[in-house]
Curated annotation (Swiss-Prot):
Originating organism: Streptomyces coelicolor (strain ATCC BAA-471 / A3(2) / M145)
Cofactor(s) required, per the database record: Mg(2+)
Lineage: Bacteria, Bacillati, Actinomycetota, Actinomycetes, Kitasatosporales
Subunit (UniProt): Homodimer or homotetramer.
Protein name: ATP-dependent 6-phosphofructokinase 3
Catalytic reactions of this protein: beta-D-fructose 6-phosphate + ATP = beta-D-fructose 1,6-bisphosphate + ADP + H(+)
Originating gene: pfkA3
A Pfam family hit: PFK
Length: 341
């Protein structure tokens, strides 16, 4: 068989581990040929690819980013390019395409699958917001990076008697904020799923100083927002791909809390450091398993599906189910965190 692989959307620790796994399973165990499209869907639409053999994937298991490159393609461009993509699949003699990506990539994969292209998806996102899989690779690395940063920030916050508002990634879901906040022993966490009351947040932070503590750490997912009418808040806008472009929750909260508490408050934005660098052992293993099972699904002809972790097993689930909704932080999980913050 001849299999095409691509990585699309934001980069993520573990992408190279998937690519490596696909090549090893397909080439060594099945005698397949694998090609990689450069820069995601753009590479498929422009027929820009390279051959992936064992030499090409040597030494990439622990490397962050993606050796294939990635890009974002506006949805309308992909819709208009379905026939071009089909033509390139036929021209290259591909039996399957394995796209590796998050919500946007999986929606694009479903579009192509619905139009008859042989697609087997692999989910990736540091946000951990794909509903049909227990975990996505990249999440563990992002939480580890954020937790290490929070551990370090505690000492400088205490030295200067400051409130630090640490902004982590999470447009629509607060999984990184929740897990890193719990792991680092933060003093408050705000997430997109639960609009916060600025009065309650101020009181919670203020209680620490009233009790004689010298600092406070607030972890804020980038998509967190206050309850309507409780504080002046700039919600930002949208980029050309339709994604929300936020105006900075950490910056806005630092101004508000400093005015209310009379304590110096500083924003800290972790940003893309959460997406870069070496994946954790957990993410390497999960990504490798996803790649292995994606190749097996191709050989079984299970198209229109993607890999998913269910318990300790890797299962195949439909792309339609995968993109139906996001996996958000439930109230019960937030309540668990609240009792220890």
């Amino acid at each position: 068989m001849r299999i095409g692989v691509l990585t699309s959307g934001g980069d993520c620790p573990g992408l190279n581990a998937v690519i490596r796994s696909v090549v090893h399973r397909a080439v060594v165990d099945h005698g397949d040929e694998v090609i990689g499209f450069r820069d995601g869907w753009k590479g498929l639409l422009e027929c820009d690819y390279l051959k992936l053999d064992l030499d090409a994937v040597g030494g990439i298991l622990a490397r962050g980013g993606t050796i294939l490159g990635s890009s974002r393609v506006r949805p309308e461009h992909l819709r208009d390019g379905v026939e071009r993509a089909r033509g390139h699949v036929e021209e290259l003699g591909l039996d399957a395409i394995i796209p590796i990506g998050g919500e946007g990539t999986l929606k694009a994969a479903r579009l192509l699958s619905d139009n008859g292209l042989p697609i087997v998806g692999v989910p990736k996102t540091i946000d951990n917001d794909i509903a049909v899989t227990d975990v996505t690779f990249g999440f563990d690395t992002a939480v580890t990076v954020a937790t290490e940063a929070l551990d370090r920030l505690k000492t400088t916050a205490e030295s200067h008697q400051r409130v630090l508002i640490v902004e982590v990634m999470g447009r629509h879901t607060g999984w990184i904020a929740l897990h890193s906040g719990m792991a680092a022993g933060a003093h408050a966490v705000v997430v997109p799923e639960r609009p916060f009351d600025i009065d309650e947040l101020t009181a919670k932070v203020g209680e620490r100083f009233s009790a004689g503590k010298r600092f406070a750490i607030v972890v804020a997912a980038e998509g967190a927002k206050p309850k309507a009418g409780t504080m002046d808040f700039d919600e930002g806008g949208k980029d050309v791909y339709g994604h929300e472009r936020f105006a900075g929750i950490a910056r806005q909260l630092s101004i508000e809390l400093e005015e209310r508490l009379g304590k110096e408050a500083r924003p800290v934005i972790l940003g893309h450091v959460q997406r870069g660098g070496t994946p954790t052992a957990y993410d390497r293993v999960l990504a490798t398993r996803f790649g292995w099972h994606a190749v097996e699904a191709v050989h079984r002809g299970e198209f229109g599906k993607m890999t998913a972790l269910r318990g300790t097993d890797i299962e195949m689930v439909s792309l339609a189910d995968a993109v139906e909704s996001l996996k958000t932080v439930p109230d019960a999980r937030y309540a668990e965190a609240e009792c220890v913050l």
